[in-house]
Amino acid sequence: MTPRAARPATLALAAALAAGCGGAATEAGAPPSPAGAPGGSALQVPSPWLVADSLDPALVPAGFGTLRQEDVNVRLQYQSLLVRLLPLDESVIRTLSPDAYRTLRELLASRREEIEALSRRYALARARLWLVSFHGIEQGETRFSPLELTVRSGGRDFRPVDAVPLTPGFGEQRLGQRETQAALFVFDGALDVNQPMAITFQTVQSTAWDAILRRVERERSLIRSRAARTPH
């Protein structure tokens, strides 16, 4: 993990995301305007790496989700740290509201070079990316090891191979009260977020993803219904 100066736009974006702001859901029963359709703005993503990820025919269409980021975040508390984790797979983030989806795609596009460099360094045929934030909730300084994270899925343990810092000072591994640090964690592509997962940070484990996955699957069904009712 090599700290580097974060771009001003990325800092503002990371701060909002780390705080759990993922866009509000639309009113019940009212499908959102899809990205690129009237009432929405087209998402411009120049990265072939991102485009390839978004062309999987098994994915639900983009721009019809209503979930908020907090609906799909896994939260863990370890001592004086609050940890939030969000898998950034297309299959997950397409269930979010159009604004939240667009924001996360733009975040990934803004860090494309670092992500691709890490994929080459670790010989990853495909990288799985998670947005992970750490928030200090007690007085005084808290030291932590951000990569002490394990995701167990399909009988295998996955640990992040590296991280792309989104906030300055992430590599210093310490937090003050109410301070937040965030990064994109890079996992091996064999990690399947569409399966149950147990997530462990240090000594604290969460299986909350099982319930989140059921919520995501329900939203996918609703998205298909909304898309089918939308005039082409």
Residue ranges, per PLM feature:
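Hydrophobic helical h-region of N-terminal Sec-dependent signal peptides
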Residues: 11-15
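C-terminal motif of bacterial Sec signal peptides marking the signal peptidase cleavage site
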Residues: 18-20
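Conserved functional micro-motifs across diverse proteins
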Residues: 22-232
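Bacterial N-terminal signal peptides that target proteins for export
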Residues: 1-10
